[in-house]
Amino acid sequence: MAIISLAEMMESGVHFGHQTRRWNPRMAPYIYTARNGVHIIDLVKTAQCVETAYRWVRTNAEQGKRFLFVGTKRQAAGIIAEEATRCGSYYINQRWLGGMLTNWATIKGRVDRLKELERMEETGALALRPKKEAAVLRRELERLQKYLGGIKNMRRLPDAVVIIDQKREYNAVQECQKLGIPIVAMLDTNCDPDVVDVPIPGNDDAIRSVKLIVSKLADAIYEARHGAAPVAEEYDYDGAEDEYEDDADEA
């Protein structure tokens, strides 16, 4: 049975790329045509890439490898947290802090601080502090939970990183390259497939497209560890809008 169908990719808008003037020529092998000034991604090739990525991820998960999911754009943030949690992986979905991987010793110190503050909150120790001090500590706790909550159980560097939007997450890509950590990435027509190890061409701006691809990768990890994956719940799209162009400017 196919990992992904052309019909579900069409329905999710996986085939819509960026405006032709904003493309990266290195994505040419994955582009089918252009319509009304917008590149259309070749879904046959996307299906092949999803199949390759699924099997690569599943094989590595079966070997006990650990994965970090990265997607900080608004359309991807909620999906990244949901799917990474479902398959027992780590995630970054707010902001990539410089040195997240290359300066892991320092970042781990902040993670340890997060755990310390959470213990203080759980045991009631925070409530015993002077009101002003407690307020400062709670603000610190909230900030650490926001940026590091998805990796608080990560004891060492991940074995592989799954990235949504290579262009936007270029800092994460550079750190992975520096450390030799394999990258699985969803790539829109403005991205560079040469800087990742396992490319998946697809619309990385539409929520349904991101959800479809990320859920397949999460399924691969879940099935490697637990057997058949449960049917994925429908993502709540309220408060998260599809965008086809705006976020590319930020990268």
Swiss-Prot record:
Keywords: Ribonucleoprotein, Ribosomal protein. PANTHER family: 30S RIBOSOMAL PROTEIN S2 PROKARYOTIC AND ORGANELLAR, SMALL RIBOSOMAL SUBUNIT PROTEIN US2M. SUPFAM superfamilies: Ribosomal protein S2. The keyword Lipid biosynthesis does not apply. GO terms for cellular component: cytosolic small ribosomal subunit. Pfam families: Ribosomal_S2 (PF00318). GO terms for biological process: translation. It comes from Synechococcus elongatus (strain ATCC 33912 / PCC 7942 / FACHB-805) (Anacystis nidulans R2). Coiled coil: none annotated. InterPro entries: Ribosomal_uS2 (IPR001865), Ribosomal_uS2_bac/mit/plastid (IPR005706), Ribosomal_uS2_CS (IPR018130), Ribosomal_uS2_flav_dom_sf (IPR023591). PROSITE patterns: RIBOSOMAL_S2_1, RIBOSOMAL_S2_2. It comes from the Bacteria. GO terms for molecular function: structural constituent of ribosome. NCBIfam families: rpsB_bact. This is Small ribosomal subunit protein uS2. Belongs to the universal ribosomal protein uS2 family. Signal peptide: none annotated.
